[in-house]
Amino acid sequence: MGREIMDMPAPAADARLHYGSDALQFGDLRLPPGPGPHPVAIVMHGGFWRARYNLDHIGHLCAALTGAGIATWSLEYRRVGNPGGGWPGTLLDAALGADYVRELAGKHHLDLAKVISIGHSAGGHLALWLAARRKIPQGDALAGANPLALHGAVSLAGVVDLRRGWDLRLGDGAVAELMGGPPEKLAGRYHTASPIELVPLGIKVRLLHGTEDSVVPIEISNNYQKAASRAGDDALMWVLGGADHFAVIDPRSEHWGKVEATVRALLA
């Protein structure tokens, strides 16, 4: 197993729908059988926010969750290297796509009281950021008028602390590419874009991270969990012994059961 999941064709979605006017503002919707209303997972793919990594590889996770009775709305978004990608466009696309669940709910029988976000790697950053949007003050470039309320959020080996990601030069400087520069020069941007700086969120947050992750150090998830708990959040972390960076998105992995159980528990 391992990184090969990135290159394996995933099961097809039920529908590919645009949430905005740009060619990259779309999502893949997968629906479980039955009349609903269905709980929903908004899924954010990883790839260090870079254009060369799209949503295809996260389709395996989406299909597995949908097989467990959860509707999945997997978002594509403009990334670094795409026109309009990077700060703020990447984050605003995530926000626009998440809010579009309201438009999908009626036709597709989705339960707006049971919506969570889940993301992997850079997508873990976006998933927790979506849960924090209500903390962003009006007037900020990332502020939204009426962000969709989430019931919980899950980070799978996520880059949930952008300042630390900058310090460690994750992905050979991926945070700098996303944000447009260092935190000492762009403190305001980092403050409203980095999930760890927006705690407490007031919802349940779950973090899963493998001990053998050589892409995103486990310390980033550990530090977020400690900061969120100190701030009063219900934030729990599971350390997955022997798991690499990609095991958490691979339904064939021995660790997949913990991922699925975590999502199901949040939506129970």
Located regions from the model:
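N-terminal cap/lid segment of alpha/beta-hydrolase-fold proteins
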Residues: 1-35
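Mobile cap/lid helix-loop segments that gate and shape the active-site cleft of serine hydrolases
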Residues: 9-12, 22, 164-197
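Short, surface-exposed "cap/lid" segments of acyl-processing enzymes
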Residues: 33-37, 41-64
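Catalytic nucleophile-loop/oxyanion-hole region of alpha/beta-hydrolase
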Residues: 52-61, 74-114
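Primarily recognizes the serine-hydrolase "nucleophile elbow" in alpha/beta-hydrolase
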Residues: 99-168
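Short beta-strand/loop motif that positions the catalytic acidic residue
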Residues: 207-209, 213
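Conserved alpha/beta-hydrolase "acid-adjacent" motif
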Residues: 214-223
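Catalytic histidine-centered segment of alpha/beta-hydrolase-like enzymes
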Residues: 243-254
